[in-house]
Amino acid sequence: APDELIVEEPMSIRLDGELIATTMRTPGDDFVLAVGFCVTEGVLHDVPVRSVRYCGQGPAAESEFNDVTVDTGGLAPTPTPRLGPASSSCGVCGTVAIGDLLERLRPLEAAPFDVEVLALMADRIDGQALFTTTGAVHAAVAFDRTGEPLVLREDIGR
């Protein structure tokens, strides 16, 4: 059987129409990625999202799947400025000042976790379709407190 290749493409993320980041991603869950990025940048903590859409207008809209806007009706605060595109690193790279990032972080409550449940999590990861066909992706998984997977997303491994 021929080898399968994974795709990676750039995606621009806009908040209320203003460009806030350009990142590389495996296409598929673009709206979730855009909203998640805004949440981790600290601009959606207390702000409702009115809509998420591709930015294409008119007859060319079908081809504008690399540009997503998160609309809050102008209620979101201005994101921390970045010096260039968002990288696939830790997320700090490209920010103008670390202090700007820390200003928007909220403390997390302590959440003790059963070590035995943690040990079982690796065995509960199923459904890596892209990895099965390409062997070239990694996954991120969110688990509930009992160790059951809630959501799994795959992306190109570096």
Language-model features, listed with the residues they occupy:
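Intrinsically disordered, low-complexity regions enriched in acidic/Ser/Thr/Pro/Gln residues
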Residues: 1-140, 145, 151-152
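Active-site beta-loop-alpha junctions of metal-dependent nucleic acid enzymes
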Residues: 155-158
